[in-house]
Amino acid sequence: MNMPPDFKHLDSPDEWTQAFPVMQELRPHLQDAASFARQMRRQRDEHYRLLAARDASGAVLGLAGYRLQMNTLYGRFLYVDDLIVTARQQRSGIGAGLLDQVRDIAHRSDCAHLVLDTGLHMPFAQRFYFRNGLLAKGMHFVESLQTIRKEAAQ
């Protein structure tokens, strides 16, 4: 019988480095563990937290990166930047466990909403979110400012 995962916030460069291979499954553009640790430090300075689901040996099985925010649309809310479970652990309940953990953090932090974005190319993630009580409320639009800067410079 499998033991339930241990949920722990990762706060040090060593812990972030250990979590890098899991995050890279979600964010393949991330190049290396050292750069990832530096990125985590910068994001932590902007109130980002990284929560890990770990097995009894301490191996990272999944991650939820989030931050508490406030805006005129949602009031105080918890925004999930990153939610990933290793390919081998998907459909094991770890993703739902991570979502429950951040939902509890949102409740304790007096948030009115839990918010996240997912790509239109990720139908399995969308189905997971629907099954776990999240509803699609809008679309996310992006414009690369790097492209605009390059075109303006030419």
Briefly describe each language-model feature range.
Residues 69-80, 90, 136-137:
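A conserved beta-turn-beta hairpin within the catalytic core of GNAT-like acetyltransferases
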Residues 2-75, 99-101, 144-146:
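Acetyl-CoA-dependent GNAT
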Residues 96, 108, 120-139, 143:
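Conserved active-site alpha-helix within GNAT-family acetyltransferase domains
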Residues 2-3, 104-107, 134-135, 139-154:
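Terminal substrate-recognition subdomain of acyl/acetyltransferases
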Residues 85, 91-104, 131:
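Conserved acetyl-CoA-binding loop-helix of GNAT-fold acetyltransferases
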Residues 106-118:
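Conserved GNAT acetyl-CoA-binding A-motif
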Residues 86, 119:
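Residue-level recognition of the GNAT/N-acetyltransferase active site
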Residues 49, 112, 135:
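Short acidic/polar active-site loop segments enriched in Thr and Asp
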